[in-house]
Amino acid sequence: AACIEWGKQTGEHIRAKALKSIVISDDAKARHIYTQVTRLEDVLELKEGRVLIVRAAMGEGKTQKIGRGFRDMAERNGQRFAALTHSSALVTELCKRLKLTPYKKVQGKLLEGAKAKEIYRFFGSCVHSIASPLIRSAFEACDVLFGDEAAQMLRSLESIYTQQTSTARDSTAQDVYDLLVKTIRTAPKVVLCDAGANDELIEWLESILGNEKIHIVETSKKSGDGINVTVHFANQQLQGEQAAITAIKKRLAEGKKIWISVGTVKLGHRIAQALRGCGHGAFIHA
């Protein structure tokens, strides 16, 4: 009986830990300002709170409706707008949607004789490069900071310290972290969006903002509504990967189609190698 009870408690602990990584808990909402909106455009009208966290389902248009909305508002008010995302691969599309100067074009524009005001007033970068001397002023002086896929952006900071991702050659991991914290603390408006905004993100913001209240905003629709998901746990990463590969092979043998999403190219290659001979497939890196 004691063993069964221990198993139940352990299961509940693991479940609670897993949920913490994918939701904003009621406890976190109670500590701050909380609003539920029916339309994303309503976020632009909210006046309470300097720092906004917007959690809305994937595909609802967070970048276009909220990011572009705050960018256009900044232009009307004569303000500077800077946007961040966690991956360099996403910056081009982000800048295209929000009408920003991409960080990779700074050097070329300076050589062409463009004025700093033209380059940096509306600016977009991946988080790893913000501390470069050519880029940092866009964030040091921005009036509105927009973070796209903010929870992933926070996790990507870890990859700098583990050297899975590099910073700009003229900056360090500590430079990046210090500037990000400084910008979030000092920008007159900070808007962080992510379908996966969670307690981890809230707690990190609390650690750098002290007693400042964050405005948490959610839409009623959640990513994955109507989809059933089974979560498996393993003590070791390789055990989890092997369990997943075994389950995938079983479904392929049954003639089913499988979509596999992974966090790193390395893991993707490893799974692709394990599935050789199991059927036809395509490896997509985006």
Feature annotation, model-predicted:
Residues 27-48:
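Pre-Walker A adenine-sensing motif
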Residues 199-251:
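Interdomain hinge/linker at the junction between the two RecA-like core domains of SF2 helicases
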Residues 1-15, 73:
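Modules that initiate DNA replication and primer synthesis
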Residues 79-92, 197-201, 241-276:
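Conserved strand-helix element at the start of the C-terminal RecA-like helicase core
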Residues 54-60, 88, 168-205, 220, ...:
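Conserved helicase ATPase motor motifs in RecA-like P-loop NTPase domains
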Residues 48-69:
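Walker A/P-loop
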Residues 98-139, 286:
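Inter-Walker segment of RecA-like/P-loop motor cores
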Residues 138-192:
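SF2 helicase catalytic motif II
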